[in-house]
Regions:
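Conserved N-proximal alpha/beta basic substrate-recognition cap immediately N-terminal to
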Residues: 1-63, 80-81
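Short, conserved charged micro-motifs
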Residues: 63-66, 95-98, 247-252, 283
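Acidic/histidine-enriched active-site and ligand-binding environments that engage anionic O-linkages
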Residues: 66-75
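Internal nucleotide-binding/catalytic subdomain
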Residues: 86-181, 185-187
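Protein kinase-like catalytic core scaffold
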Residues: 131, 191-195
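Active-site "cap" helix and flanking loop/linker of ATP-utilizing ligase/carboxylase catalytic domains
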Residues: 160-181, 187, 197-245
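Peripheral (often C-terminal) accessory segments that flank ATP-dependent C-N-forming ligase machineries
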Residues: 221-283
Length: 283
């Protein structure tokens, strides 16, 4: 083993730090520690002049009432939680769920009037050396990514801003490998950084078929110190996540030459579990 990498951010920092004493871990363990906590992640973004929704650290019910200017908003656990887990909608200070466990720390984020969600995937190979994929447009259902498409239907201003912010993030983190920045666009065409994923990302799975170099190959090239290949889009593409029982129809389907089915071969089908994905390219 020459280098260690990972594709799941909820790995305890102590484990990554210990591994890093044996062989280099990329992305660096300190980056993952920063991003694992939604509050420190938001602070990092704001310190770098990257707009986020308004937010506050919440330790108890009184903190929610003090921050009533953030309501309506979304209460999220500061750590863990994935695909909408550990999240609570707060509409009124009098309507706080009894399911909230205040032995944990939370972040309360004010809702924006959402028009669209996009993501930008970037691979950093070292100081100011990048390969950047154009923004991908995403649609979530029940807080789980359902559809992605490239190109995103967005203004040139938003495209440039989203790409620029992703570059700043990768550079300020001294990141090596592929990362994704997820964004909100509001009804006034303002861009907000929602979160950073320090890994290859679900929305970027379509790059396997849409580009000459996928997000996965670029990640491996970066962490292994291999040659950087100029990344080009070959086809526009749309991707559908296959969640739960959706996978069963696709396992028996016949596909056209511009359709690609990926079965993750998970042993158990469960509700809200990502079982595979399906990509269509526009030839």
């Amino acid at each position: 083993v020459n280098v260690i990498t990972y594709e799941f951010e909820n790995i305890p920092y102590k484990i990554l730090k210990k591994l890093n004493e044996i062989k280099p871990v990329l992305p660096k363990p300190e980056i993952n520690k920063l991003i694992q906590n939604r509050y420190t992640e938001k602070d990092f973004l704001n310190k770098n002049n990257i707009r986020t929704t308004r937010y506050s650290l919440i330790k108890d019910e009184d903190d929610i009432k003090i921050n009533d200017g953030l309501i309506p908003g979304l209460l999220k656990t500061c750590t863990l939680g994935y695909d909408g887990k550990g999240q609570f909608k707060i509409d009124k200070t009098e309507n706080i769920s009894s399911e909230i466990d205040f032995t944990k720390e939370y972040i309360l984020e004010k809702f924006v009037k959402l028009k669209k969600e996009i993501s930008v995937i970037i691979t950093r190979f070292g100081h100011q050396r990048y390969e950047i994929y154009e923004p991908i447009e995403n649609l979530h259902e029940d807080q789980i990514l359902k559809h992605s498409k490239i190109p995103a239907q967005i203004s040139e201003k938003i495209k440039n801003q989203a790409t620029n912010w992703a570059t700043i993030i990768a550079e300020e983190l001294d990141y090596v490998g592929t990362l994704c920045v997820e964004y909100f666009i509001d009804n006034k065409d303002n861009l907000y950084a929602n979160e950073i994923a320090p890994r290859v990302h679900n929305s970027g799975h379509l790059t396997i078929n849409s580009h000459n170099v996928s997000q996965f190959e670029n990640h491996i090239r970066a962490v292994c110190g291999l040659e950087k290949v100029e990344t080009k889009k070959i086809y526009n593409a749309r991707m559908l996540n296959l969640i739960g029982n959706d996978i069963e129809d696709y396992r028996v389907k016949n596909f056209k030459d511009n359709e690609f089915f990926f079965d993750y071969q998970k042993t158990e089908i469960r509700e809200k579990r990502k079982m595979g994905h399906f990509t269509i390219i526009e030839k």
